[in-house]
């Protein structure tokens, strides 16, 4: 029996706040990548 578990989790959070002359600019970038590979071999 062969059991393989590969888990890759990538979380990127970018928060940019700019305040210019009573101007409010909010930029939020959220990138979430989840890769799950499961292999089960029974002989």
UniProtKB/Swiss-Prot annotation:
Residues 1-43 are annotated as: Disordered. It comes from the Eukaryota. Residues 1-37 have a biased composition (Low complexity). This is Putative uncharacterized protein DDB_G0293968. The lineage of its organism: Eukaryota, Amoebozoa, Evosea, Eumycetozoa, Dictyostelia.
């Amino acid at each position: 029996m062969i059991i393989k578990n590969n888990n890759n989790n990538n979380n990127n959070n970018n928060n940019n706040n700019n305040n210019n002359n009573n101007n409010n600019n909010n930029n939020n970038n959220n990138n979430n990548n989840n890769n799950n590979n499961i292999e089960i071999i029974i002989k």
